[in-house]
Amino acid sequence: MKYGFAGSLAAACLAFCLFFCPRLEAGKPNVIFIMVDDLGWMDLACQGNKVVDTPNIDRFAAEGMRFTSAYAAAPVCTPTRAAVLTGKSPARLHITTHAPGGFLPKASKFLPAKTLIDLPLEHLTIAERLGAAGYRNAFLGKWHLAGDSRRGANGKGNVEFYPEAQGFHINIGGCAYGGPPTYFDPYRIHTLPPRKKGEYLPDRLVDEAISFI
């Protein structure tokens, strides 16, 4: 039985979640959700950055809604992603640090909280909710919710917890990796086949996103 989805927003390698209604109906807008790891509150030009230009993101901010007092659910990637997908706090999900865990120094006097390294399938995700409402969903980029990337070749991990099992119809690049082995093709990511040697990973993901749209 799936647990209920509670609304949540958190901003946190790069991932796109694309939710599109094949026949756009009134009240059912298409959705593009972009998550960026380790993004500081003033890293975007629209937030006051005077060094880096981010014109496209600035346009999103100007034409959409800005949450000026929002906080990420956790300071690291895996629990934040799990929280965004499910609307639940990392503590309730038992995902409290980035997979595969075990990052405390060996000499530490503290015991780490028991943490899962997969997103259990019984938790209902926003992708599953939107799929039930008629949306077709794609995931592109970093997933990092499918076990230990050292299990299997090229970040395979636990395939039974991939985006396809969590409400996404298309998965491009999502696997157990917490970061790509390289940012240039060939990427050595088994869910992202080589296309053009030397190609830059962010460019590839954007091309794939545009193709899906």
Language-model regions, residue ranges each:
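Bacterial N-terminal signal peptides
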Residues: G7-F19
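Intrinsic disorder/low-complexity segments
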Residues: M1-G7
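Formylglycine-dependent sulfatase
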Residues: G4, P22-I213
